Amino acid sequence: KIKKNNYMRISFAIESIHSYSLIHDDLPSMDNDDYRRGKLSTHKKFNEAVAILAGDALHDLAFEILSDIKTHPSSKRRILIINELAKTLGSKGLAGGQSLDLLYENKIISTSKIIKMYKMKTSELFSFCCVAPFIIANKNKKEIKFAYDFGQIFGLLFQITDDLLDEDQDFKSLGKTPGKDKKQGKSTLSSLKNREKIKIFCMNEIKKFENRNNKYLIKNHL
């Protein structure tokens, strides 16, 4: 059982990372967006230097929170979570995925490469959100693997949906500038497939997840 203080501190750390990633994502050298959540993005309201430093501070705050004994008395579990977060944000996770996002602009990219990019820049963080409480609760490797796998499919579907919303929603709905992916030549699944094919793809991915985790789902949730 996880105490409220444990999961609240993990939540604070995750939100710090989320906010850092959005601030840096909006920078002129990245996605160059003037708005976030219906308000001026950090670099527009203040300046680019402040935005970079604010993002850096929020990034570091997450590790400060997770390393504190208040998060959990077991140093081993805290180290495991910190290690997991470091991998999530590094070259095989968020940072690597964002670099691919920039590299793939105005290029014809295969579906498999786009999905890999989605998983790196989005799914890895979703997986961390799912795995961290399992680590704190001292769950076994199979249970942690299930949590990771769930985060992967959840993050993938979220990113696909986010790209679709960018195409057909307005500023009021999104809280940011719509249609930027197409204008910037972003490689997205919707740039390769129509809506019906994307729906089929998503349903197949869900089915794969269910098949991989069928025994766990039946044992623990039915």
Each language-model region and where it sits:
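Mg2+-dependent prenyl diphosphate-binding active-site environment of isoprenoid biosynthetic enzymes
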Residues: K1-N214, N220-H221
